[in-house]
Amino acid sequence: MKRIALFLATNLAVMIVFSIVLNIVYAVTGIQQGSLSGLLVMAVLFGFGGSLISLMMSKSMALRSVGGEVIEQPRNETEHWLLETVSRQAQQVGIGMPTVAIYDSPDMNAFATGAKRDDSLVAVSTGLLHSMTRDEAEAVLAHEVSHIANGDMITMTLMQGVVNTFVIFLSRMIANAVSGFTSSDEEGEGEGGSFMTYFIVSTILELAFGFLASFLTMWFSRHREFHADAGAAQLVGKQKMIAALERLRMGQESQLEGSMMAFGINGKKSLTELLMSHPPLEKRIDALRQM
């Protein structure tokens, strides 16, 4: 309940701030709100704004969502090994030492997030630490560190911002045309009817275009996973990376809770593969073997 309340409060605050900023931009530039240029300004502001704010808050939101505990001082040999391994890999790829956290989950999962290469987070589940060998866990960590080194979080945010901008702009532009056409053809409807037409059409189009755009963003996400696997193979050797993926394939299939779960994926092929953020495990293993 607290997490939902925090999410709603954050979104409300973002919407209020965006509205204020948008009105200031219109006032300073003299752009008319109903014009195409005004619509484009609004689409860019809202399209990129949400993505950038989510990126800036990603570390704290990720830790809160999984109940992760940051390792400040290692309390046991496993935590000491975890910090030492991440530190060594970070030095190898030339990034700052990420914050390292552990969260309680029986699934073999890990994820990386953060707005900067030198201010990032790597979190691993207790299930991964208990179920994988050190070599396999090392490969998983290398995969996450490679995501950070490649700037995947920032790249995905920028891509999502561009996609959001096009979805908002096209939806509102078409809705403007439709509402203008219907209001001129239908007598007695007035401004209220025109607004309702605009609202309904723009909402439906944003949902439809957003769904279609998700195929593109998920394709890009799968593409970056192959790069992270290759980066991990360079850090620790491809046999360790293959062994980690084989362990995941043999393990219990995990159900993801959002795009931040960067390593736990379902290896089963299905018709929904185009909407998966990760390639099937078999394809990732084959790609590594062909390196």
Swiss-Prot record:
Binds 1 zinc ion per subunit. It is a multi-pass membrane protein. It comes from the Bacteria. It is found in: Cell inner membrane. The active site is at 144. GO terms for biological process: proteolysis. Its EC number is 3.4.24.-. One of its GO terms (cellular component) is plasma membrane. The keyword Cell membrane applies. CDD domains: M48B_HtpX_like (cd07335). It is an enzyme of class 3 (hydrolase). Zn(2+) binds at residues 143, 147, 225. GO terms for molecular function: metalloendopeptidase activity; zinc ion binding. Keywords: Cell inner membrane, Cell membrane, Hydrolase, Membrane, Metal-binding, Metalloprotease, Protease, Stress response, Transmembrane, Transmembrane helix, Zinc. Its cofactor is Zn(2+). This is Protease HtpX. Belongs to the peptidase M48B family. The chain crosses the membrane at residues 4-24, 36-56, 151-171, 199-219. InterPro entries: HtpX_protease, Pept_M48_protease_HtpX, Peptidase_M48.
